[in-house]
């Protein structure tokens, strides 16, 4: 369900005083009340879940009930204010559902001042302006019954989730100030057009940056041949999801005797909650650089346009693991003291059987995406051949793309359930994998008129000459560094140690498929034709 209310206003104040021509304004307020609902069945879901929101909390399955070691030391650690919360093992299968309540509020205001004038043979048009955006959400967000939480993310050991209200996320305030100058210079029969501008963007509480751009065109042969060029930098601000990600929650099961023969009153669990802030303080605005160079040729009724371009980004947004999102935590395991108390309403004391360092991991927003795009677009309009009453147009494009990541790849192989033998985390070079794609396509359109019977026949022939993708691989078999499960710190890796027992869990040589290096063959051209008679 979506219910919305939108208010818009805009206007122009004409001044016409010297170079100052007018002032334009625009403002809008957009409010949307959203409600969505989801329900599904969780299977193989017998994992621990705690209602605690506090890092280091240790709860049992009965709210407020303490659990002790055999020497009287209390195992449970219940934070103030969480005395009514519990932690328990979820059933293997259950129905879960959640609602998402949103109250989106977006405001926008823009003010533009336009100037125009002439200095000698040069015509000027100057634009100065500013805009402001405010966006946020006052809704309750994702709401679910804590007794039946949504299915957890199986990609991360012990990962869990909690309710989080959208209204707890700060509003985003985005201010922009810009200036643009447009010049038209007549030099005899030649015309030079230049449009240059710069914009400053500021996201409050995040960062700022400048975005310059310039477009220019000049007549090489007046009315026949024009050379065009452009260069610009575009900054993209992150969304609220990237600025204020949810915290990473983990629920480690320290003890569970639910599957034993213990009486129901003596079955219990002990679960430790770990909470980590997933916010990236070093996140910055994504920067995209683009340049173009083109030619426009006009001859009689024929028009030929061709543009070559390049687009590059080295810090695009992504959400992934980083060197800072691996945390080594002590994982304590207990067993119960036997015999159990004769009073079946009393639970047994525990004894510690093992404490092992465990490497937890989560994701964080990053500027790790990079790509390079090069291409050519063309549009050839041959005009209408009057003798046969037929017009011809040919257009097409060629595009080559390379994309990858500036981030490391993390990998290890876990075998068995002995936590004392869990491996370190292998850290592999960022160039471990690069994606490529290439595409060439043309489209021919022929339009024929038959005025005697009032018909127009249009034939379109589209050909995809090349459309393929492939990958290249760097060192994706032997790590260059590793994160120790013992202390969570980063260490350089000596390749000579790859065969040692300590590092067998980060050796990918036996898991990578050698056929990955074989490129697939190029498919033959694909022709699609369409005939339309009107």
List each model region and its residues.
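Surface-exposed extracellular loop regions of Gram-negative outer-membrane beta-barrel proteins
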Residues: 1-10, 37-43, 55, 78-85, ...
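Outer-membrane beta-barrel signature, preferentially recognizing the C-terminal barrel domain
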Residues: 2-6, 166-170, 234-314, 333-345, ...
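Hydrophobic, lipid-facing positions within transmembrane beta-strands of outer-membrane proteins
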Residues: 3-11, 105-111, 173-179, 196-198, ...
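Short loop/turn motifs that connect adjacent beta-strands in outer-membrane beta-barrel proteins
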Residues: 14-25, 116-125, 185-192, 220-226, ...
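Transmembrane beta-strands of outer-membrane beta-barrel pores
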Residues: 15, 29-35, 132-138, 173-175, ...
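Surface-exposed loop/turn segments flanking beta-strands in extracellular/periplasmic regions
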Residues: 45-89, 139-163, 248-275, 324-356, ...
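Outer-membrane beta-barrel transmembrane domain signature of Gram-negative proteins
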Residues: 52-192, 243-246, 410, 422-432, ...
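Gram-negative outer-membrane beta-barrel transporters
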Residues: 187-189, 312, 329-473
